[in-house]
Amino acid sequence: MSKSIEQFPKDLSSPLIQIKSSVEKNSKLHIKELFALEPERFHNYSVKFDQLFFDYSKQRVTKNILEQLVALAKNKQLTQWINRLFSQDKINCTEQREAMHWALRLPSEYSKFPELTKQVHTQLQRMYTLVEKIHAGQYRGATGEVIQDVVNIGVGGSDLGPHMVTHALADFKVKTAKPLNVHFVSTMDGSQLSDLLHQLRPETTLFIISSKSFGTIDTLSNAQTVRQWLEKALGKHDRVVKSHFIGVSTKAEKMTEWGIIPDNQLLLWEWVGGRYSLWSCIGFPIALTIGIDGFQQLLAGAHAVDEHFQNTSFERNIPVLMALLGIWNNNFLNIQTHAVLPYDGRLKYFAAYLQQLEMESNGKSVQRDGQKVELDTCPIVWGEVGPNAQHAFYQLLHQGTQAVSCDFMAPIQRYNADHFTYVENAEALIEQHHLALSNCLAQSRLLAFGNEALDAAELKNLPIYKQYEGNQPSSTLLLKELNPYSLGMLIALYEHKVFVQSVIWNINPFDQWGVEKGKQIADQLLPILNGVQNDLSTLDASTRGLIKILLGKVDG
């Protein structure tokens, strides 16, 4: 249990004090005992909504603890905060901005915010027009050839979200007039770009410069490199930049200054946080892959969760439950690391996406009022595709000394839809899907129940190094199938989970000041490494020593 809870005043009616009392009474209860005490536990601790099923029966909670967690949420005025989120309030207090990513998935006919909805759909329609043109083979490069490769240049929210979704929904790739491939480049060292450019033809390649500020050095350095690559092959003509670059940013003037024509500029707004931006024109690579209908289904799934989040009681509200269970594990059971374990290879990049969403949002130590936080905030979030993880770090989960909470996720159905091109192999592939599902269930069962999950005869003479303690809590999210709609739902669940936890911790989840200063210090060091400046006197001894090695002034 977080020691900071001891700092709270001893008001016996305080939800925190009541929960602390429950910890003292229930901390030694094993998950297997919770199931023994409550035969209907699976039914009582699970929620079905639309295409999602959420099972949290393997969490170390009781009915009484859940009631107290809900009371804590109410005490923190969660309902009022949800209402503020879904308004035009500037709840991003440190930057004096709204946080209206939810507006990006409003249906076009939504009447509550007509002007806002119109703004959003105007930009989406401009994106859809470009998508249709590229898909039809009508968008041509400087030499008149049809574009067949599109490279998204971005970093952080301009890369992680679009990359994750594009990979996850590759089965839903639409047919185009000519084959179209979408690629992603993010690293500032040029390694990804170097490998990729060898595979591409300048005449048929289009680049998306995706940067909210249009000032991110990682992105602009890659953009400048590909510009030189294009101009070397096609000549330094205005039509090269005009035909081979599309920009996505809040800064139209910066895109124009760089050379991107207005027709190729897609806009978003300051109230769209980078890690919440895949629903906007930052999602251009997604729409290029799964088509306009697919992209609209992605938005519709997220909007369905927005409605669920706003209109469902906390006791049956999936993102609220996910958040409160995380609070329970982190702040009361002292479980400060959380693993994300999808049992579907298409969700390969989901854990990396969640790392930014959760840790950049809630990795804070200062409250909204400027005071230090009273509770530990975001746990370490990590993970991997489940079957691969079983051969990497499950040893630690099962028999290590660290307490870890886990989210398992899997689709119920796979390899049975008309759009799959490998129907002739469906029977064997369905068996492989069942193999993945059986492993997903087996691992969550063993983590929860430990030796109880083993055969009694086997356990009788089992040496201690082969035994399992169990009691590692987990939730399981099942999707009817992995499609644009259900993936939109899944992502929005985690967005709102993050928001709920920020309310409990009283922090601002929509800024990222911890990211900014490192970039500024890098800007100060770059002239030294480039030989333009040589004054190292203001630097610490370690940084001075490393710079001298990098410049070849001393041996490493």
UniProtKB/Swiss-Prot annotation:
The active site is at E360, H391, K519. InterPro entries: G6P_Isomerase (IPR001672), G6P_Isomerase_C (IPR023096), Phosphoglucose_isomerase_CS (IPR018189), SIS_dom_sf (IPR046348), SIS_PGI_1 (IPR035476), SIS_PGI_2 (IPR035482). It catalyses: alpha-D-glucose 6-phosphate = beta-D-fructose 6-phosphate. It is an enzyme of class 5 (isomerase). Pathway: Carbohydrate biosynthesis; gluconeogenesis; Carbohydrate degradation; glycolysis; D-glyceraldehyde 3-phosphate and glycerone phosphate from D-glucose: step 2/4. Keywords: Cytoplasm, Gluconeogenesis, Glycolysis, Isomerase. GO terms for molecular function: carbohydrate derivative binding; glucose-6-phosphate isomerase activity; monosaccharide binding. It comes from the Bacteria. GO terms for cellular component: cytosol. Its EC number is 5.3.1.9. It holds the Pfam family PGI. Its main location: cytoplasm. One of its GO terms (biological process) is gluconeogenesis. It is found in: Cytoplasm. The keyword Cytoplasm applies. Catalyzes the reversible isomerization of glucose-6-phosphate to fructose-6-phosphate. NCBIfam families: PRK00179.1 (NF001211). Belongs to the GPI family. This is Glucose-6-phosphate isomerase. It comes from Acinetobacter baumannii (strain AB0057).
